[in-house]
Amino acid sequence: AFGNPVADTGKALLCAAKPVTDLGITAVDDKTLKVELNVPVSYFLSLMYFPTFYPMNQKFFESCGDTYGTSADTVLSNGAFVLTSYEPAATAFELVKNADYYDADRIALDGLNYQVIKDSQQALMSYQNGDLDITLLNGEQVEQVKDDPEFTSVGAGYLWYISPNMDAVPELANLNLRRAITFALDRDSITNDVLKDGSSPAYTAVPAQFATGPDGSDFSADQTKFAEFCAYDPDKAAEYYEQAKAELGKDSFSFTMVVDADDAPQKVAQVVQEQLQTTLPGFTLELKVEPKKQRVQDMQDGNFEIGLTRWGPDYADPMTYLGMWVTG
């Protein structure tokens, strides 16, 4: 996870220069939390919606022991809805309106019923049969229903990217090899011809229409340097590839990329594999398909060469993306 030390002395705390008691956060009373900020932070309140900051009843938590959060009876919360039915690996869970919620009069829904349907076609059929009110679609389904008046396209804000493990694989630390890889990727083809689900090619580190700068313009409009290195340019790819081969003293390269066992990531990975191996002679990319949980764990442990992964925004500020690239 990536965050920013917006609380008073937060940076010093992260660097272990000060104790937790100096963080700048005080419990005024049982229902009031005071946070002192270093600078004005427009997105601070939205940070408080993040699960990391949910209040926890210590007495209840300790009474549940290892079973905390594993069933409806071991979950205690103060939100707009109350979890009434849930079991691990359940195919459905239910929430009902919390009558004690401080703003209950403004909550229009009486409850929410979630159905866990792993097969995307079955999920669409359940929607069409009236069993679901909302469902997510894959690219093929979007093609089928895009003219339906009930179809709505909403940007999720996820940024998919290829992560090279430069610490474990010395060749990937070579700048020219990485430049060869990025110029060999046709992002427009991936989104328009493969995904076909409304996804946009990523030419900026912060997606368009996510945030505005101080002058009111779209923040992504100024990310020209990032866009420059995301352009599909086979000639530049070949040029950087030759430089990389000369610097590394190798004519061929072989890497393995870990990929989620879901439909869309696998399709993208196959196209990435084809584009790289076609544009860069002697470049081999093997695909290792894993359940998402295992893929994430392997990448966290450094047990990978290249990973196809994604990042979604945690709060409404460009640093939710840019913070990933800050070192030190």
Per-region residue spans from a language model:
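Acidic-aromatic pocket-rim loops
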Residues: 1-6, 294-328
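Structural transition elements
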Residues: 201-243, 264-266
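A ligand-binding cleft/hinge motif common to bilobed small-molecule-binding domains
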Residues: 136-148, 313-318
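Ligand/substrate-recognition segments at binding pockets and active sites
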Residues: 88-90, 238, 242-313
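Gly/Pro-rich hinge or "lid" segments in bacterial periplasmic/extracellular proteins
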Residues: 7, 11-22, 31, 37-107, ...
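Ligand-site clamp/hinge motif
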Residues: 99-144
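Immediate post-signal peptide segment of exported/extracytoplasmic ligand-binding proteins
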Residues: 77, 105-110, 175, 234-256
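Alpha-helical secondary-structure segments
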Residues: 30-36, 79-80, 109-111, 158-211, ...
